[in-house]
Design a protein with these regions (language model features):
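Alpha-helical solenoid repeat scaffolds, predominantly canonical TPR units
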Residues: 61, 68, 115, 152, ...
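Flexible, polar/acidic helix-loop-strand segments at domain edges
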Residues: 241-312
Length: 444
């Protein structure tokens, strides 16, 4: 460590904590997408003698970054505890939450290269892989996870429990799910500190959040030449119908109307079941600083909308998952968190349906693990989380197949359709769609 760091100033220790987290986050994103990669902890030499490196085992990389994250936590303040440490800076809450996320991936399933890194007693193969389509070994590539996966799940549970149970924890669920997205689009901080960390962008300088995905708006409608809400990222009717119709999150995850000129300028309902827009980003929620630039822009203008890396419900759901998978049950209360796995899940669902709603307890229709799998889909739609979750659970192939079958049955119209925890009959899907406009005849 440098002389400045060793001097013991709290500022230098905070900077060290931020640096450790950012490096760990970078390697984490590489490893969970690419597996075994080149890895080094020191600086590159001026003669480039340590630049060209071979791959090393992902388990070794995970072990290193977990250790770094554990160190970083000790140096970091809670959000708001020190001036300028807001959701755009690395803070204690995010570092602990990120360590939990890293630990779950470190202990999760992934495709492994058995030729370069042969399986041994430290690696556990996917059970009954040859009888599980999509999970069988192919050309020495196999699905595996570390044999000590429970150690990582213990880390995840502990870190989440410490956040939940700490009286100094400043993070809470925003009571209004829509407020999360209206605030971030408007370049405002979340009042409840729900967002543990946001990648900071600047209007006119960086960030295509909203222009590449979000509620669709055509160009040349009085707000500038360019439109908003592209289809670079979109979803489909299968995901829409997975929601309970009373779930407050549904119309933020899936948004059918397009704002365009159809006689007059208004929203028009589209019915492409394979291309449903994400509703979490809207031009009409953006900051005036962005709109004023967009009004005269001839090319795509960076919105400045921050990308939310982690929200507080992730802490609750990771806690619930890790505790349950460690065999501690869904109803036993954690001494550290002060709540059970089931209660953590219910807190997330209470916001979606309202406290006291009978729908909050509908998760009991399925196994608790399946309830967690479903809840994470509904809570984090369009946030870049689902695919990677399914990989670490070993469920990516089977969930894709379930979706394909369901959508074929939806189009066929002669079979019951299973979508998540719901069974639909063909006649439940409408042939005609009725909707109404607001008092101005502009928005549905």
């Amino acid at each position: 460590a440098s002389e400045a760091f060793n001097s013991g100033t709290t500022a230098m220790r905070r900077y060290m904590g931020e640096a450790l987290v950012l490096r760990s986050l970078s390697y984490f994103e590489l490893v969970r997408r690419w597996g075994d990669i080149p890895f080094k902890e020191g600086m590159s030499n001026s003669d480039l003698s340590n630049v060209y490196m071979g791959k090393i085992n992902r388990d070794s990389i995970y072990a290193c970054i977990v250790k770094d994250m554990q160190e970083a936590i000790e140096y970091l303040p809670w959000v708001g505890e020190v001036a300028d440490y807001n959701s755009e800076r690395i803070t204690k809450g995010f570092a602990k939450g990120m360590l939990a996320r890293i630990a779950l991936f470190a202990g999760g399933w992934s495709v492994r290269d058995g030729k370069e890194f042969p399986a041994n007693t430290s690696v556990e193969r996917y059970p009954n892989a040859e009888q599980s389509p999509g999970m069988e070994e192919v050309g020495e590539y196999f699905i595996g996870r570390p044999a000590n996966w429970r150690d990582y799940y213990e880390i995840a549970e502990q870190q989440c429990a410490e956040i939940i149970g700490d009286p100094e924890n400043p993070h809470r669920l925003d009571p209004d799910y829509g407020d999360i997205w209206k605030s971030v689009c408007g370049l405002k901080a979340n009042t409840y500190n729900e967002n543990l960390f946001e990648v900071a962008n600047g209007v006119g300088y960086s960030g295509d959040i909203g222009t590449l995905m979000g509620r669709a708006m055509d160009g040349n409608l009085g707000y500038g030449q360019r439109g908003f809400g592209g289809t670079y990222v979109s979803t489909n009717a299968y995901y829409f119908y997975s929601f309970d119709q009373n779930d407050a999150r549904r119309d933020y995850a899936c948004y059918w109307p397009v704002y365009k000129k159809d006689g007059t300028i208004k929203e028009v309902m589209q019915n492409d079941i394979m291309s449903v827009r994400l509703g979490k980003w809207s031009f009409f929620w953006t900051a005036e600083s962005y709109r004023s630039i967009a009004l005269t822009a001839t090319a795509r203008t960076p919105t400045g909308i921050n990308w939310i890396v982690m929200r507080y419900p992730d802490i609750l759901l990771m806690f619930a998952e890790a505790r349950y998978m460690l065999g501690k049950g869904e109803n036993s209360v954690s001494d550290v968190a002060g709540i059970s796995a089931a209660r953590a899940l219910e807190m997330v669902r209470e916001r979606a349906f309202g406290s006291g709603s009978e729908a909050v307890m509908d998760y009991k229709k399925v196994d608790f693990f399946d309830a967690i799998v479903n809840e994470r889909a509904w809570e984090f739609g369009g946030e870049g989380i689902r695919k990677l979750d399914l990989i670490r659970w070993g469920l990516l192939d089977s969930k894709i197949e379930e979706m394909k079958v369901a959508m074929l049955y939806m189009l066929d119209g002669s079979h019951p359709i299973q979508i998540f925890d719901k069974t639909y009959q063909p006649e439940e899907f409408p042939n005609k769609l009725y909707f109404k406009y607001d008092e101005n005849g502009e928005f549905i």
